[in-house]
């Protein structure tokens, strides 16, 4: 399953607020489709599926990519759910989003893919790159790159930069000083339900 490229508000009406996907809020709280009918009680499977979809749409990844992240999270020490969130938070496109370089994760991915971002002084156009402590993430020293980021920094998608990102706004550069803690993950998600969803599938 590839990345979703349809109407984003349709997704947020169904799944709730997804700060990585869009900064717009759905005007109607009811899910898309026909209305007025009583909703059936959701099964445990449906609840787990919804949490999985939240994660996938918020970070803008395909089903295949998410499966790979789940497998990787299982191989690491500690809680699989927490490991999964940290892997997604460490993606270069997400780090750029958290710094305010892009208005959303898709917008930040576009900056990366078009060569506007450097890691440790070198242009890196791989949005899935796993950022690690010590990495320096910057906007490329080009007028066009700076102008794009400046416009986004005036109205960042999220108000607060996580404490593990040492950000110098004037230089449009940040150093990763540690790991992203669970409480700084922006999306409201029950990661344990995501792990349970994949328990018999992966």
Swiss-Prot record:
Q: Which GO terms describe its cellular component?
A: small ribosomal subunit
Q: Where is the S4 RNA-binding domain?
A: 90-152
Q: Give GO terms: molecular function aspect only.
A: rRNA binding; structural constituent of ribosome
The keyword RNA-binding belongs to this UniProt entry's keyword annotation: yes
One Pfam family assigned to this protein is Ribosomal_S4
> What InterPro entries would the database entry show?
Ribosomal_uS4 (IPR022801), Ribosomal_uS4_bac-type (IPR005709), Ribosomal_uS4_CS (IPR018079), Ribosomal_uS4_N (IPR001912), S4_RNA-bd (IPR002942), S4_RNA-bd_sf (IPR036986)
From the UniProt entry, list the residue stretches annotated as the region Disordered. 15-42
**What UniProt keywords apply to this chain's record, in alphabetical order?**
Ribonucleoprotein, Ribosomal protein, RNA-binding, rRNA-binding
Q: Name one GO biological process term.
A: ribosomal small subunit biogenesis
- Assembly: Part of the 30S ribosomal subunit. Contacts protein S5. The interaction surface between S4 and S5 is involved in control of translational fidelity.
Q: Which NCBIfam families match?
A: PRK05327.1, rpsD_bact
Which HAMAP family has this protein been placed in?
Answer: Ribosomal_uS4_B
State its role: One of the primary rRNA binding proteins, it binds directly to 16S rRNA where it nucleates assembly of the body of the 30S subunit. With S5 and S12 plays an important role in translational accuracy.
Q: Which PANTHER family match?
A: 30S 40S RIBOSOMAL PROTEIN (PTHR11831), SMALL RIBOSOMAL SUBUNIT PROTEIN US4M (PTHR11831:SF4)
Q: Which family does it belong to?
A: Belongs to the universal ribosomal protein uS4 family.
What is the protein's given name? Answer: Small ribosomal subunit protein uS4
Q: What is the lineage of its organism?
A: Bacteria, Bacillati, Cyanobacteriota, Cyanophyceae, Synechococcales
The UniProt gene name for this protein comes to rpsD
């Amino acid at each position: 399953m590839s990345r979703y490229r349809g109407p984003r508000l349709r997704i947020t009406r169904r799944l709730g607020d997804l700060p990585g996907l869009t900064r717009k809020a759905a005007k109607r709280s009811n899910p898309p489709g026909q209305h007025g009918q009583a909703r059936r009680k959701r099964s445990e499977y449906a609840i787990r599926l919804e949490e999985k979809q939240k994660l996938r749409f918020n970070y803008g990844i395909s089903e295949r990519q998410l499966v790979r992240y789940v497998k990787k999270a299982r191989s690491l020490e500690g809680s699989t759910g927490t490991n999964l969130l940290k892997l997604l938070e460490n993606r270069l496109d997400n780090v750029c989003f958290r710094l305010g370089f892009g208005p959303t994760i898709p917008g930040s991915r576009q900056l990366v893919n078009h060569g506007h971002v450097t890691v440790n002084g070198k242009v890196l156009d791989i949005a899935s790159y796993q950022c690690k402590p010590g990495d320096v993430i910057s906007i490329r020293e080009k007028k066009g790159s700076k102008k794009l980021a400046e416009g986004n920094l005036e109205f960042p998608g999220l108000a607060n930069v996580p404490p593990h990102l040492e950000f110098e706004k004037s230089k449009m550069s940040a150093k990763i000083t540690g790991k992203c803690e669970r409480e700084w993950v922006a999306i409201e998600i029950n990661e344990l339900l995501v792990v349970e969803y994949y328990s018999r599938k992966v």
